[in-house]
Amino acid sequence: MSMMKIGFYYINELLSRIDCTQLLKGNPGISGTAYMFGLISTQLAERDNGIEVTYFAPHAVNGSPKMHVEKVNDVVEAYRKAEATGLDYLVVKNNDANLLLEKLPPPAQSQTRIVVWCHNFLNQKELNCYSRCPLVARIINVGREQMDVYRDHAAFRKSDYIYNTVQIDQRYTDGLTPVAEREDVVTYMGCVIPSKGLHVLAEAWPEVLRKKPNAQLYVIGTGALYGGNVTLGKWGLAEPRYERYIMKYLSRDGQLLPGVHLMGIMGNEKYDILTQTKVGVPNPTGNTETFCVSAVEMQMLGIRIASKRCAGYLDTVRNGVLVRNERQLADEIVRQLDADVSPDDSPTYFAQHFAPETIIGEWERLFLKTIGKDVHLHPVLPLSNPDFEYKTLKERLRRLKLRFPWLDGLLPTVNIFVDLNWKVHSFLGKLKRRLTGDQF
């Protein structure tokens, strides 16, 4: 039986500094996307599954000895090498797929097809491109709710989802202190950039302190979490203008407020803080969240979540409350701190549902059982969370377009109007900050 040949392409210089064979022990302090590319490619190569893996990158990758590593300058060179060596599929992140499809004229015939791994939400241009391009074999989302955002677009027919995998070393998950017995510790974990929302938690923090004066806030991460040449402010937290806005709420007279701790980028030592945390606040804007590894890690350690209702959290938040408005965040954090919570099965549920064995198995099924037969891993019905972002209407449009395919080019998708509403809301927020001198 011939081997299935799969390639991965993703640029992140941090992958050259870590041992990808140790990623099963947890994220060592790199971005979630880099962590997933390193972990999935390495584990697919390690297993006896009939899959041969090649990793394309402009830098070294310390992966499995069974994984081939090819040095390339960009995604176009990666695709050309993949095609020349007879790979069946090349897995790329959506922004790299965009660059590839813009620069590389689709060949008349090609053995190597593209699997677009979407760690971000897609715009209409991307959806149109992927749905029409014969080179794109599958659009893999990292969550069911992320995929459902485009339910009424033609690209949905090429779409499927495989959740990210999350693993925490057993020494941190064994013998957890019950959350009700923990002190009033709140933790934010993620990159400190505007789209990840630390400023929303910072704005809420004075109100939290008014009601819970002894509460503590830990911030794990900086604006340099994703790598690159990033200039941080004097606190080493974020880009200077954004940092100044955040610290307006978290400092006084040039000193951190009592109980505020800026921890910087952390590896597995972050779990020493998380195991003592009562309430976790991953990205409280919900913007950009297609899955949120941080939210899952927190819940695996018994932490209650307080954040905003969004697509990614509908898939991954089981132990906590998702508010509909950012102004409700402070009150919800206080409620979660005061909650008399009985132990539940959330840590066990998450450890099983997002276990590497489960998720790697999904990737193997994708390549070995479904993609070549043009079938999907998951059924499109029944609807989950039908009240979220007009999903019931999207489903009606999907069925209508299946019946009358010529409507694809005539009827706009519902998400065009959802995005427009978000852009107006975002513009008004920026305008308000500019008028009040709080622009970042």
Where are these regions (language model features)?
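Short acidic alpha-helix that forms the nucleotide-activated donor recognition element
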Residues: Y79-T85, M247-R252, G267-T277, M300
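Conserved donor-binding/catalytic core segment of Leloir-type glycosyltransferases
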Residues: K5-Y9, I140, Q170, T177-L209, ...
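A short, active-site helix/loop in glycosyltransferases that binds the activated sugar's phosphate group
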Residues: K125-Y130, P134-Y161, V166-R171
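Short hydrophobic beta-strand element within catalytic cores of glycosyltransferases
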Residues: M300-S307
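A charged, aromatic-enriched C-terminal amphipathic alpha-helix characteristic of glycosyltransferases
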Residues: G32-Y35, Y271, D338-N415
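Acidic donor-binding loop of glycosyltransferase active sites
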Residues: L274-T290
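Nucleotide-activated donor-binding/catalytic signature segment of Leloir-type glycosyltransferases, i.e.
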Residues: V230-I265
